[in-house]
Amino acid sequence: MEGGRNCVMTVQQWQPEYNDMNQIRAIFSLLYLLVWVGAIVGNTLVLYVLTFNQVSLSVRTVFVGCLAGSDLLMCLFSLPITAISIFSRVWVFPAIFCKLIGVFQGGTIFVSSFTLTVIALDRCVLILRPNQEIVNFPRAVFIVFCIWLLGYSLALPVGIYSDIAVYDEICGTFCEENWPDFNPDTGRSGIRRAYGLSVLVLQFGIPALISSICYWMISRVMSDQLARRRGHNIRPESETKLVNRKTRANRMMIVMVVGFVLAWMPFNAVNLYRDLFGISKWYSTVFALCHVCAMCSAVLNPIIYSWFNPQFRQSITTLFKGTDEARLIKKKPQSTSKMVSYPTNFSEIRKETEIASTKTKITIAENDYRAGDQLL
């Protein structure tokens, strides 16, 4: 008997699943622990460098800080609660958390996806319109506010329709989604299916498409720039340097898009399968694997968007050396996105480049640069 109910079996006895096996639980416990520690350490270091170190306040720091904060919150609260719920298969937390966790988890996921999209758009605008102040510091802060408001608003339906459930014969308390048109015979809901499809499009489809287009446009500008420079009889070593920069930048952009797709596509696919076909004996195990992959984005994001930046690397190195070099440069707000220093050196603008040939010496001044010249 439990809480006045005559429960006669556990949920594991009533409906066994593969994730009830101790071997599977041990494997996933290790995976979740590694992701949890990696994400907390990585994003905490990013926030430390942005807040207390020598990185200037700029458009880029606003967006990267938003991404790191969202990922950190997701791993501090959402990850452990979801992991425990998957493998215990009962709700062991306070009842109010049943409603809050759905909103919190969905909101942080939306915020991360939208922030990654905004970073891609900001880079693209910076390259295509380098002489125009499109996004300044106040606008960046406002954009971040809108991202958080929109992200958590889109996640509200899960919280509204989530509630505690108990069953007479099954021991334990459960946190379940109870949509208005839920059919207990089929275990499906048309409203939940429509909402799931909307989440797939808004959280994964549109961000992946926009990011891919932005980075493709950036790559095209870089290729045009490299071809234009080659027409000036540049020295072989200068051409090699330009090619290496283009290759490095292209590699980084590919990692950004592929990392986002590989992290979130399985998670969205398994959720879509649940909405369309219901759950089966293997669903919880596959969901756990896809959830681990999605949480890996919180480990990958600090590496891609922060640590590949030489300034961040130097600050982190200084931090671990225990010196005070990180505070030598006073933080100073920058009002234009042209001051942004992206991890792949996209915004490095060379004031003057001398191109030597056998008979002539061509000097290209700063005002002779075209859109995208700061990429290489």
From Swiss-Prot:
Segments passing through the bilayer: 30-50, 67-87, 90-110, 140-160, 198-218, 252-272, 285-305
Q: Which Pfam families match?
A: 7tm_1
**Molecular function (GO) terms listed?**
G protein-coupled photoreceptor activity
* Cell compartments where the protein resides: Cell membrane
Q: Which residues lie on this side of the membrane: Cytoplasmic?
A: 51-66, 111-139, 219-251, 306-376
Q: How is this protein positioned relative to the membrane?
A: Multi-pass membrane protein
Which Cys residues form disulphide pairs? 98-175
A Gene Ontology cellular-component term: plasma membrane
What biological-process terms (Gene Ontology) are attached?
A: cellular response to light stimulus; G protein-coupled receptor signaling pathway; phototransduction
Keywords associated with the record: Cell membrane, Disulfide bond, G-protein coupled receptor, Membrane, Receptor, Transducer, Transmembrane, Transmembrane helix
Q: Which residues lie on this side of the membrane: Extracellular?
A: 1-29, 88-89, 161-197, 273-284
**Chief localization class?**
membrane
CDD domains in the record, alphabetically? 7tmA_NPYR-like
PROSITE patterns noted in UniProt: G_PROTEIN_RECEP_F1_1, G_PROTEIN_RECEP_F1_2
Q: Give the protein family.
A: Belongs to the G-protein coupled receptor 1 family.
Q: What else is known?
A: Functional expression in mammalian cells is temperature-dependent and requires a temperature shift from 37 to 28 degrees Celsius for receptor activation.
The UniProt function text for this chain reads: G-protein coupled receptor for flp-15 neuropeptides. Receptor activation assays suggest binding to predicted flp-15 peptides, GGPQGPLRF-NH2 and RGPSGPLRF-NH2. Likely involved in Gi/Go-coupled signaling pathways.
The identity of this protein, by name, is: Neuropeptide receptor 3
Name the gene behind this protein: npr-3
